[in-house]
Amino acid sequence: MPVMDEFKEERAALKNASFKVKWNYFWDYYKWHTFGVLFVLIAISMFIYTSSKGTETVFYAMFFNTDLTETFNEEMGKEFLAYAGIEDKKQVALVDTSYYLSSDSTESGVGSALQKISTFTSTNQLDVLGGPLDSINVCMYDGYLYDLRMILTEEQQEVYEPYFLYSDAAILEKKQEAAKNSEIFEFTYPDPTKPENMEEPVPVAIDVSNCKKMQLIYPEITEQMAVGISTGTIQQENVRLFVDYLFEE
């Protein structure tokens, strides 16, 4: 049976279906479209809100899988502004710890986090992504992280190179090619500390497990922690300063 005929039959059957059946149909077919529209609206709303308050967001970081209060997030944003020497009261730094991200795409909240990252990256509102290595692996191999050599100064590269974490660009390319063909590319995340075992190693994240600032964000660190620079950033100077800020004693 032609696809269009099947679609027409489904639509006809839905006319007399219960609300629950109709809702399940809608959710199965349109949930990602719905998430996309919602996050675009959220991005627009945030822009309108900050504009109406006369404020400008000069830095935005997302840290995954932690549950901190808004007060903590605001204080950390203010502390970073002070560190960066930004004294304009109309400029704000936002730290967002409200999202969960895991390599297991079936876990609750993962879809929302990925949609938020996608939307805020495409609208140049996202600067830094941080969290457990499992979360950052997702960002690495979804193509959301910059090659650190493109952003960090030569001096910073010398200082932080011992903490660099690498992704394999060859795997990312194969994954993206498969996506273009609507195919699923299955792979195992390579060890990011062993670029010598990769086909095309690229430094895209920094191990921040021992940074005191990360220990405040994650009071009970039991795994490797990392941060990477969003490919959507237009605040490169502030991003460089934030990396230094995280490593401050």
Briefly describe each language-model feature range:
Residues 234-245:
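Short amphipathic alpha-helical coupling segments at ligand-binding clamshell hinges
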Residues 106, 111-196:
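Extracytoplasmic "Venus flytrap"/periplasmic binding protein-like
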Residues 54-133:
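Early extracytoplasmic/lumenal segment of secretory-pathway proteins
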Residues 1-4:
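N-terminal targeting leaders characterized by basic, low-complexity, disordered sequences
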Residues 20-29:
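Aromatic- and glycine-rich beta-strand/loop motifs that create alpha-glucan
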Residues 220-235:
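A bilobed periplasmic-binding-protein/Venus flytrap-type ligand-binding module shared by bacterial periplasmic
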Residues 29-51:
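Hydrophobic membrane-insertion alpha-helices, especially the h-region
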Residues 8-20:
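Short, membrane-interfacial amphipathic segments enriched in basic
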